[in-house]
Amino acid sequence: MKLGWIEVAALAAASVVSAKDDLAYSPPFYPSPWADGQGEWAEVYKRAVDIVSQMTLTEKVNLTTGTGWQLERCVGQTGSVPRLNIPSLCLQDSPLGIRFSDYNSAFPAGVNVAATWDKTLAYLRGQAMGEEFSDKGIDVQLGPAAGPLGAHPDGGRNWEGFSPDPALTGVLFAETIRGIQDAGVIATAKHYIMNEQEHFRQQPEAAGYGFNVSDSLSSNVDDKTMHELYLWPFADAVRAGVGAVMCSYNQINNSYGCENSETLNKLLKAELGFQGFVMSDWTAHHSGVGAALAGLDMSMPGDVTFDSGTSFWGANLTVGVLNGTIPQWRVDDMAVRIMAAYYKVGRDTKYTPPNFSSWTRDEYGFAHNHVSEGAYERVNEFVDVQRDHADLIRRIGAQSTVLLKNKGALPLSRKEKLVALLGEDAGSNSWGANGCDDRGCDNGTLAMAWGSGTANFPYLVTPEQAIQNEVLQGRGNVFAVTDSWALDKIAAAARQASVSLVFVNSDSGEGYLSVDGNEGDRNNITLWKNGDNVVKTAAENCNNTVVIIHSVGPVLIDEWYDHPNVTGILWAGLPGQESGNSIADVLYGRVNPGAKSPFTWGKTRESYGSPLVKDANNGNGAPQSDFTQGVFIDYRHFDKFNETPIYEFGYGLSYTTFELSDLHVQPLNASRYTPTSGMTEAAKNFGEIGDASEYVYPEGLERIHEFIYPWINSTDLKASSDDSNYGWEDSKYIPEGATDGSAQPLLPASGGAGGNPGLYEDLFRVSVKVKNTGNVAGDEVPQLYVSLGGPNEPKVVLRKFERIHLAPSQEAVWTTTLTRRDLANWDVSAQDWTVTPYPKTIYVGNSSRKLPLQASLPKAQ
């Protein structure tokens, strides 16, 4: 071996684990595919090659490695290349707005976007976020998320993504990406992949909770399930031209997500044709050589652990290229991928330096905050980037509110004599909307969950504020009891009320914070803060009780949903800063609810199957999460096991009624599917490397403490690496073929953005009439499901949908197409997609269990 960089022990341990017959194994795939500028990347790829060809080795390395935690203004920043006018890139959370900032908007969460089933709103939200990120001087938004997908209803970060259905998630994921990047900011598709729970996602985090485990959890999944479920939305992201992908903390089949050659090299880069760059989640980088050869392109935040001053890359990456352990083409490819994404969104024309600091709200501070070094300068310029986005946020909040039950209670008229507002979730956080770091508490109304996927509220309109305004405009009376434990007061208010509006919630978040004993993942899926008793007390004392649920996902409502005095139930999710106004718009009929549930409402937690792994189930080794449920999650699981939900996936009521009719199917003149064949071009080197003496620290450089630099300490590479394992034979740790830059065979399922172009060819055109049969304007979402026909397939899978607005008595024809991908299964033996000979049937309706229209499809290939 020529260079180990601390990863030798980890790699050795991994080889022992993977050699055990009873643990899942991730097969190697090498070499790491090099970008080729296919499709819409062609022009920016050429520009990237041109600029990278002019760079020195350390300039290339500077692009690949973060400068260290809290050492610049953003949560992650790369080095810069001043000689070529390439700035340090600013990377910043989150998927719903700018984290650690000010004068920014707090958008609805991804799960709310899923509930809208509205592609336009997904795009507009992405675009609005991109505008704010760009205006703050941020180059890369760390979002959106499709991992977790939602295998477990109690998974802590499900709300950051969209839905446990891959098709619904994939479409809205892609539209969000397009919106962000059209605003001139690189979007990051995360967390890739199988990051489905918080428990054990990071070994150090688990140790902090008292678990003695050697490594992070391994999500063990078969090839078919990976392709048909978890990889599906990431294919949509690649097809949408996403610039960055963030690899995850967990292991996949006992190989870490940021050094897993199967998921990074094979699936993402070779099969899906991803042309952008792969960054690590923060400290998810576990090796130097191993990660570089397995397909990682950018190390974030650059240091091995926060504020350690050490890095797997930086100077060590420079050493690795100089001594030949890592081929030049691999680091060149990293740099080209980063620069291609930079050019693709136009950052070269829109760049402004970050005008805020993540680490202080003070106007002035040190340039390098954590170590109090560098210039003492203006670090916060307090730039207001909100524009008119509050209107969009309010709109999404209202249009994502799912009406689950309505026995004539809604809409309200403002003529109600007395309105009772009941439950803590109606009111404000007594510590302020941003009173808990990263929203790590559940005080007052829940409009955002907790973790790094959050943003500071510029303000938060509570339900109490908004509804009181409504009542007073109607000259009514309003009583509010926001102590969820004061059941006697709640009962007294409910007895007097014309209508009782009960607000309840259920929270979750990221595993580094524990809230009320919930370590990221929910301990259960019941209501928090005595919610069930608040509802039952109100219903026992008021015959017109309407329940509004703010939650991160499904909750158990079996105790009271069918109570005769519960006349209405709405799910409002995590609606962001305009929460109260959004729910008031729906309650008072200014917005007719048209949202559909993006998940299933079961009667028990057990009805969902697939429990979280909350105990160390592999001794002191990496906990093992076996995804034996395969593709059967959420509604697919309920269908397979004949579980009757309370409210099914895709369900949602309206203040009007709709009728679907006249399903027509037209076969299209599609070509026969052809597996991709042939060879790639050989890898190319861009520029010359030169001698080690060119990459020693520049004379006179004033080093910043703990800052990660690309330069080496001396021309003695062994001494510069400071690695006791330096000098081992390559065969002991470098996988076969990992440094081979010759032409490589193309995979059958590859060939374009998102995979083989034949997958996206339209095979059938489908049309359905949709009519508003009621008296008010409203939105309907026709949903098209497919039965793939095989004995081990789900009963139905969602494939197409559209949100359509119709005036009273108006009729429209919804037309969509079915692609080969929509009808295909993954063939593990052929390593390609195939349309099986089993009969295919399509169903159209307005939920996964209300599908009145059906048609058989002719055989397709």
Curated annotation (Swiss-Prot):
Q: Which GO terms describe its cellular component?
A: extracellular region
Is Signal there in the keyword field? yes
For this UniProt entry, the molecular function terms from Gene Ontology, in alphabetical order, are: beta-glucosidase activity
According to the record, which residues are glycosylated? Answer: 62, 212, 253, 316, 323, 355, 443, 524, 543, 565, 669, 713, 846
User: Pathway, according to UniProt?
Assistant: Glycan metabolism; cellulose degradation
Recorded catalytic activity of this chain's protein: Hydrolysis of terminal, non-reducing beta-D-glucosyl residues with release of beta-D-glucose
Subcellular location per the Swiss-Prot or TrEMBL entry: Secreted
Q: Identify the catalytic residues.
A: 281
Q: Which GO terms describe its biological process?
A: cellulose catabolic process
Reported EC number(s) for this entry are 3.2.1.21
What PROSITE patterns does the entry give? Answer: GLYCOSYL_HYDROL_F3 (PS00775)
Q: Which family does it belong to?
A: Belongs to the glycosyl hydrolase 3 family.
Functional summary from the UniProt entry: Beta-glucosidases are one of a number of cellulolytic enzymes involved in the degradation of cellulosic biomass. Catalyzes the last step releasing glucose from the inhibitory cellobiose.
Q: What is this protein called?
A: Probable beta-glucosidase A
Can you name the source organism? Aspergillus flavus (strain ATCC 200026 / FGSC A1120 / IAM 13836 / NRRL 3357 / JCM 12722 / SRRC 167)
What would be the name of the gene that encodes this protein?
bglA
